[in-house]
């Protein structure tokens, strides 16, 4: 049993077995797990916003889907991952508050999921599984040994994807 490496909000980290990696409290944020199943190298980024180019205070690259995913790929390659072997699992992107509006700025969760999928597609990293949207938060734990992403939500049964 290894260490559980924590990833905070607008943060990222990488790990190898026997360690696992987790992030807590994904609401509209998206937790993105990238891993190389052959080398069992994995990483996670907890993104808050879809696009760094639309924000002035954008120094924290882990905060954004566009820059966070790029940096996570870089860190995984340094750890020994093979670029063409990387695959993804994603969770989060909930609509945490009920409202009736067509204002695109209020659809943060949906926009985060869209930006994540677009970025992964542009990098040719397939998404093997996802648990996104709806109206509840999630905590996720990834085990690089089994490639399972455990998803916990209040009042919901745990699931593995």
From Swiss-Prot:
Stored InterPro entries: CheD-like_sf, Chemorcpt_Glu_NH3ase_CheD, Cytotoxic_necrot_fac-like_cat
Catalyzed reactions per annotation: L-glutaminyl-[protein] + H2O = L-glutamyl-[protein] + NH4(+)
Protein's name in the database: Probable chemoreceptor glutamine deamidase CheD
GO biological process: chemotaxis
GO molecular function: protein-glutamine glutaminase activity
Function: Probably deamidates glutamine residues to glutamate on methyl-accepting chemotaxis receptors (MCPs), playing an important role in chemotaxis.
Keywords assigned by UniProt, alphabetized: Chemotaxis, Hydrolase
Protein EC: 3.5.1.44
Broad class of enzyme this protein falls into: hydrolase
Lineage of the species this protein comes from: Bacteria, Bacillati, Bacillota, Clostridia, Lachnospirales
One Pfam family from the record: CheD
Organism name: Lachnoclostridium phytofermentans (strain ATCC 700394 / DSM 18823 / ISDg)
Similarity field: Belongs to the CheD family.
